[in-house]
Amino acid sequence: LLIDILTRLRTEQDSYYLLFNELLHARVLYEKSMYQECFQVLKKVKEKAVYYENHFALLVAQRLELNYLLTLDFEDMDEQKLLNKQYKMNNTLKSIRQLNEQSSLYELLKYRMINRGASRSLEETQKLDDLVTSEISIVASAGVENFEIKKNHQLFQANYFITVGDYKAAFNSFVELNKLFEENSHLWNNP
């Protein structure tokens, strides 16, 4: 009972809880053969997932929709519409992959910062260049506006500049990060 109450409260505060809870509703509707209602819920989840930039919920909603359409023998669907849905899902996967690659680079940078400390020589700074080059490549190839990519980029830059001792540049990255958050308050989760 307590976990149910806490989950309900978090659903009102956190888009992850909200979206995944609605995905569960869609599954129940499908299991009860309420297909139209199920697809309506999935459509709303996809719209909200795009708004909140929740690529994981979007991917699950897209996959469920295609699985359900397959089970229903693609009733009332033409091939072009199916291809469009598959294309959108592949773009979602691409975004998730880019976020994961960028997060991996940031984690590696933080690991090196923690275990090696600040760069004390040109040689130590050059050892970080591979991470910087890879991270900038991911940001440049992202193509679409993406809050998480921008956030991770500013965090990466700030921590890199701290590591190499360029505190003014690190401060500027944190200022940009703060500005990014202020411009995207709808993406905040309220703990």
Which sequence ranges carry the predicted segments?
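Intrinsically disordered, low-complexity protein-interaction/activation regions
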Residues: 1-32, 70
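Start-of-helix signal in alpha-solenoid helical-repeat scaffolds, especially tetratricopeptide repeats
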Residues: 12-20, 57-59, 66, 99-103, ...
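Tandem amphipathic alpha-helical repeat scaffolds
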Residues: 22-31, 63-72, 104-123, 151-166, ...
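Amphipathic alpha-helical segments of tetratricopeptide repeats
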Residues: 43-51, 84-94, 130-142, 171-187
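Alpha-helical repeat/alpha-solenoid scaffolds of the HEAT/ARM/MIF4G superfamily
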Residues: 75-130
